Amino acid sequence: MNYENITIRSMTNTDEAAVCEFFDAMGGESRAFFNRMNTNRKHAVSFCQTPSQKRRYFIAELDGKAVGLVFFLDWNTKIPELGVAVRDEYQGNGIGKRLVRFAVDFAKESDKGGIILTTHIANIRAQALYEELGFSCLGTYKNAKELIYILRYTDAI
């Protein structure tokens, strides 16, 4: 399949059903890594219903199907927090890398100073991607189940 045809666009109030379907399709590992306690789903659906200036959400589509999400929390700060997820059956095809690069470029063009994110300590594939793209691991988060990564634009790809 040609993944070059993926489009990344801002999420709108018409995307609620696609967002719900995206989260419903997540397998156990994806839920554990990305949607523990259903928090990311709740925030994404809430954003569809009532957009906030403190957040930015984007949806990646292929043939009309949501194959990825990328979002920023705390957008009104100099270094917002990034979240990325790829639909299970599309993982391992470079879509996550494309979404992170999109996010890096978008934040940089918006005069942000960098990006911060957390990832589950067992999510080795994501850690490798973030490090490949120039993120530095700062250590474990207070719950010791997540690692904190930062990308300062002086370090960027």
Where are these regions (language model features)?
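Conserved acetyl-CoA-binding loop-helix of GNAT-fold acetyltransferases
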Residues: 92-105, 128-132
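A conserved beta-turn-beta hairpin within the catalytic core of GNAT-like acetyltransferases
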Residues: 74-82, 91, 113, 143-145
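A short beta-loop-alpha structural element at the N-terminal edge
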Residues: 6-19
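Acetyl-CoA-dependent GNAT
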Residues: 10-13, 24-83, 87, 154
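C-terminal "cap" of GNAT-fold acetyltransferases
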Residues: 113-127, 131-133, 139-157
